């Protein structure tokens, strides 16, 4: 084997190892590559303003679930806030998961973890079809946005917001009045893979 080919083999091996390491450690999130355009619109919404932070997670470190399998979501904020949790499916179908029928108030105390669903809630958060599901977590120190007041649909635990993610993203930002008031706003998201 010529020295050039040997060098090329080493470079390709190093690049492959580096990409695998980055994906495994979260430096590069491989799930970002599979978000649909409708999901990216929500994930890329510019909501963060002020110094409040938000943390979110699901109950599985590998974030992989079977179709129809229940998921447990957790969120906490660094300040007293109002929180909303959205589920965005690959086709853009968006559901407001929190506030919900069991928790009509969107309030969360600073540095306390909110878990949805809680064991006594009587409902489950699931995804029925394989693909990547985006969970967007939004918080504000002001509670006047429709996102924190929206009631669930009749005979449902949640509110269906439709499939127009671009319109929903714009409406969320407008309703939160990001940067136009003294309120802190923060958002983060978690993606899960449904197999």
Identify the function of each model-found stretch:
Residues 1-8:
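Bacterial N-terminal signal peptides that target proteins for export
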Residues 10-13:
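Short, linear, compositionally biased motifs with a strong N-terminal bias
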Residues 19-195:
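Secretory-pathway glycoprotein ectodomains that are cysteine- and/or Ser/Thr/Pro-rich
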């Amino acid at each position: 084997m010529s020295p050039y080919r040997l060098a090329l083999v080493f470079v390709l091996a190093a690049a492959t190892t580096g990409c695998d390491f980055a994906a495994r450690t979260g430096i590069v999130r491989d799930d970002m590559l599979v978000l649909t355009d409708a999901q990216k619109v929500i994930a890329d919404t510019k909501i963060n303003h002020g110094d409040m932070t938000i943390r979110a997670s699901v109950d599985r470190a590998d974030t992989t679930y079977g179709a129809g399998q229940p998921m447990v979501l957790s969120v906490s904020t660094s300040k007293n806030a109002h929180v909303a949790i959205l589920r965005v499916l690959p086709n853009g179908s968006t559901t407001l998961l929190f506030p919900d029928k069991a928790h009509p108030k969107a309030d969360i105390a600073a540095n306390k973890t909110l878990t949805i669903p809680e064991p006594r809630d009587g409902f489950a958060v699931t995804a029925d079809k394989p693909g990547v599901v985006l969970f967007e977590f939004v918080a504000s120190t002001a509670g006047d946005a429709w996102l924190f007041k929206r009631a669930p649909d009749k005979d449902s635990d949640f509110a269906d917001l439709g499939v127009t993610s671009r319109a929903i993203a714009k409406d969320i930002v407008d309703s939160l009045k990001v940067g136009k008031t003294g309120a802190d706003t923060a958002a983060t998201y978690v993606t899960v893979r449904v197999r």
